[in-house]
Amino acid sequence: MLKGKTVLLGVTGSIAAYKIAGLASMLVKQHADVTVLMTQNATNFIHPTTFETLTGNKCLIDTFDRNFQFSVEHVAIAKRADVVLVAPASANVIGKIANGIADDMLTTTVMACACRCPVLLAPAMNTNMFENPIVQDNLQKLRRFGYTVIEPDSGYLACGDTGRGKMPSEQVLFDWILREIACEKDLAGKRVVVTAGATAEKIDPVRFITNHSTGRMGCAVARRAMLRGAAVTLVCGRMAVEPPPFVEVVRAESAAEMFEAVKAAAQDADIVVKAAAVADYRPKTVAAEKMKKQDGALTLELERTTDILAWLGAHKKPGQTLCGFAMETENLLENAAGKLRRKNLDLIVANSLRTPGAGFGGDTNVVTLLTETEAETLPLLSKDETADRILDKIQTLRKDESK
């Protein structure tokens, strides 16, 4: 995902410095070229050899180190950087950067990078230090200059206090870096609505009717759209996975709740991808108390739910692109093509429950992308890769429509 990308990690003097070893390892596993820059104080918390072993690159500390092939090192490395993350960012280094002080390898490199690539800072310090008006003023100044400040978590701190100032987890920092550099931002400025997961229709306070959807495919589409620069709203039912970061999440338990949420979200959407498995039927009446077991059969009277995709197709706005999904057990292409026409879709993603590697629950999928004029069957791919191919197709359709 990060092959060919150069990530600079700036580590300052904080007990949270040890966490960056895990982050460096995560980035290397995604094939990023990682270089760590440390302040002298940071070396009191973690040894440079740790980072050199994990990244395969020399850890840079001294601006005047003579043991390298000659170049103006802080400028040379800044030219290669795709993103810089200063984490943990101490109050001292935050103050230096905010006020133009560049007196060591880390701060001079950040100064050289700030005008040419994203620079992120993750403050980590005692609560009283973080809330000090001077620190807050420096952070606000950095935001005005275009730096991104990753807000600290609240929790138990190394000093024994409880409050704000805890550096976010390695996964959170990793997600921030991915957001900046993992993909080309071809969806920047676009609003994308994605539905995911399964709805649940109550029978009584204990039981409900649902399906096998886990939300993995819809979440993959939402995640990839976010990484490609879109503002994403994810309307989700029950899911076996967590929603991706940096998306607006709207929870919807029933088909009726999802319909209302989708109607509201789709009003100003450029792209709508309806990947949720929504119940076609619901109990006509919901029992107020738990239904007791009894001899003999139980009959439930069901009624149709609103067809959300058909409503979206009937109310599609000019310039809006609508993508649906079709899970079938027979006559895949015929049934999917019929759904495409009936519901006024621009694209439908068809997959068969009978195909190995496709369907619910897994991390892979095998789909066919159908439009009015063509059908393209994709090979077995991860759901992230499938999501990218779906978004690629949507972008192609939008470009063709604008000609």
Model-derived regions, located:
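A cross-family phosphate/adenosyl-ligand binding-site feature
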Residues: 1-121, 126-403
